[in-house]
Amino acid sequence: MAHKKAGGSSRNGRDSQAQRLGVKRYGGQFVLAGNIIVRQRGTEFHPGDNVGCGKDHTLFALKDGVIQFSIKGLKKRRVVTIVPAAE
């Protein structure tokens, strides 16, 4: 009789999808209202003038303009602001 051993089973082979976090638009770049600037977990970057913060802490542009990153306050928070384009 021909016999074939049972194939082994593996307990590996699973991995979660990458979350694609990080800075999406950099300082000096021109953005349109609604463009995503930073995707993050928690407020690594804080919203400044003309920047909104979503419920998942995503920072996005509220007006068209140029992005500016700066460090402010005693806590040295990284703040993202948008200098509006001249209308």
From Swiss-Prot:
GO terms for molecular function: structural constituent of ribosome. GO terms for biological process: translation. It comes from the Bacteria. Pfam families: Ribosomal_L27. One of its GO terms (cellular component) is cytosolic large ribosomal subunit. Gene3D superfamilies: 2.40.50.100. Keywords: Ribonucleoprotein, Ribosomal protein. InterPro entries: Ribosomal_bL27, Ribosomal_bL27_CS. Belongs to the bacterial ribosomal protein bL27 family. This is Large ribosomal subunit protein bL27. It comes from Dechloromonas aromatica (strain RCB). The gene is rpmA.
